[in-house]
């Protein structure tokens, strides 16, 4: 019994040692080895704050958001009486990818040129989290017929 337990422990140790090594500094690098791992819709590196603000339009403001919820874009069709029940209970199924909705956002302002020298700050340098376009008015769906309030939408999803 002691021999088989020792052999099992030794076999486990050898198999763990044989696994390929991963980069230790790769945690949280996100899409393309850049930024936060929660950024599903990255913004291209050459987009400036001014260009991003123009893309959001005059009814929304450019924001940097900490929290993201993704839904839409994926539809699963399950067949049978209990098909997909477990998957939907644990968070899989329809709505696992797609449109990014954000909260805990702070506004990204355009820099005012100092002494006539325009500053073209890149949006990815100003915000390392989720970059989004947020409504200027507070999101409140209580008086709405549909009852839907979309406070912020990922900038990368509309580019």
From Swiss-Prot:
One of its GO terms (cellular component) is fungal-type cell wall. Its main location: secreted. GO terms for molecular function: structural constituent of cell wall. Disruption phenotype: Affects the ability to disperse conidia which lack the rodlet layer and are hydrophilic. Lowers the adhesion of the rodletless conidia to collagen and bovine serum albumin. Does not affect conidia in adhesion to pneumocytes, fibrinogen, and laminin. Stimulates the host immunity. Increases surface exposure of beta-1,3-glucan and alpha-mannose on conidia which stimulate significantly higher NF-kappaB p65 nuclear translocation and cytokine production by macrophages from mice. It is found in: Secreted; Spore wall. PROSITE patterns: HYDROPHOBIN (PS00956). It holds the Pfam family Hydrophobin. The keyword Signal applies. Residues 1-18 form the signal peptide. InterPro entries: Hydrophobin, Hydrophobin_CS. GO terms for biological process: cell wall organization; conidium formation; sporulation resulting in formation of a cellular spore; symbiont-mediated suppression of host neutrophil extracellular trap formation. Keywords: Cell wall biogenesis/degradation, Conidiation, Disulfide bond, Secreted, Signal, Sporulation, Virulence. Disulfide bonds join 56-133, 64-127, 65-105, 134-152. Aerial growth, conidiation, and dispersal of filamentous fungi in the environment rely upon a capability of their secreting small amphipathic proteins called hydrophobins (HPBs) with low sequence identity. Class I can self-assemble into an outermost layer of rodlet bundles on aerial cell surfaces, conferring cellular hydrophobicity that supports fungal growth, development and dispersal; whereas Class II form highly ordered films at water-air interfaces through intermolecular interactions but contribute nothing to the rodlet structure. Self-assembles to form functional amyloid fibrils called rodlets. Self-assembly into fibrillar rodlets occurs spontaneously at hydrophobic:hydrophilic interfaces and the rodlets further associate laterally to form amphipathic monolayers. Belongs to the fungal hydrophobin family. This is Class I hydrophobin 1. It comes from Aspergillus fumigatus (strain ATCC MYA-4609 / CBS 101355 / FGSC A1100 / Af293).
């Amino acid at each position: 019994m002691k021999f088989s337990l020792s052999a099992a422990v030794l076999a486990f140790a050898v198999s763990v040692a044989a696994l390929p090594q991963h980069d230790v500094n790769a945690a949280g690098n996100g899409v393309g080895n850049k930024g936060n791992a929660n950024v599903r819709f990255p913004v291209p590196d050459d987009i400036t704050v001014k260009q991003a603000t123009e893309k959001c339009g005059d009814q929304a403001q450019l924001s940097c958001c900490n929290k993201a919820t993704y839904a839409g874009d994926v539809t699963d069709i399950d067949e049978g009486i209990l098909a997909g029940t477990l998957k939907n209970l644990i968070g899989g199924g329809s709505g696992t990818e797609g449109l990014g909705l954000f909260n805990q956002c702070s506004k990204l302002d355009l820099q005012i040129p100092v002494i006539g020298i325009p500053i073209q700050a890149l949006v990815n340098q100003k915000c390392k989290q989720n970059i989004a376009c947020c409504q200027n008015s507070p999101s409140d769906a209580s008086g709405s017929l549909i009852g839907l309030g979309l406070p912020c939408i990922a900038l990368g999803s509309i580019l």
